[in-house]
Amino acid sequence: LGLRGVSKNARQAQIDEVLSRTGLQRFARTPARVLSFGEQQKLALARAWALNPQVLFLDEPTASLDPAGTRAVEQIIAAIQSGGTKIIMTTHDLGQARRLGDEILFLHQGKLIEKTEAQSFFERPASNLGQAFLNGDLLW
């Protein structure tokens, strides 16, 4: 925020607001190096959100997190979405795609196979590859 010319007082207000919206107030003065991996993931999302992006790209944002950490990160992602930021996320987690996705772009071997609403993809995939993936028959 400082690089964007935001004053110190405005920066602090914006940081406090984002920490509050993400439930991370207790980490306001904690050095990132002492946080767990899951806490670092949550803080990284909060930092990105503080910039008020129109689009946020997330690559496997919950990889290597335990279920509680995954749930917490997904809650922050949902809050960011509800604030109007478009999220583009890669995931191999079908449950996560179902919970967070409104549109699915299904790729296989670098090629776009399907682009559709999430509900349509999970209920009626338009391709045999999409169906095989949902059935667990397509591993890579």
Predicted regions and their residues:
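Conserved catalytic motifs of ABC-family nucleotide-binding domains
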Residues: 52
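H-loop/switch region of ABC-family ATPase nucleotide-binding domains
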Residues: 91-92
